[in-house]
Amino acid sequence: AFPAAMRELQARGLIEPIKEAIAAGRPYLGICLGLQLLFERSEEGEGAEGLGILAGTVKRFSFEHSVFRIPHSALKIPHMGWNQVSSDKRQATSDKRCPLLEGIPEGSFVYFVHSYYGDPTDRSVVALEAEYGVRFAAMVWKNNLFATQFHPEKSQSVGLQLLNNFVNL
């Protein structure tokens, strides 16, 4: 999906307008692939380059070297279903909390459908994390840029609160 989406953005002339809108301070909300495309590159497709707005790589889940003691057969790819998210430690101790998380309890459950996850070089952009064989960025936030790996539109009241917070920025 990543290489095809980048080709489509290129064909429609949308890469520069997206970058310009984000640079101009317009709120951006990326969902699932919309988070992944923000990164420099992806393991999905050889040499797949992203928008390069966030430093880092989109990686495929691989449980061969998992630090968690979970049988490989217990974790299926794609990661599909409900999973708990928590604030990144730096976000939790910061005076400045992501405005899209207002009214969302710590440890909420959200709905995921993905085989790849963004791995940012700068961990300070991670607003929420989840675990699925590895800890990964479930949500990133930098200034006016917000993006979720999970699907807020499928995450019931938590997702609706997040979307409402975005609309009311």
Residue ranges and their predicted role:
Residues 23, 57-169:
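Amide-donor transfer/coupling interface in amidating biosynthetic enzymes
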Residues 1-66, 72-80:
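Cysteine-nucleophile active-site neighborhood
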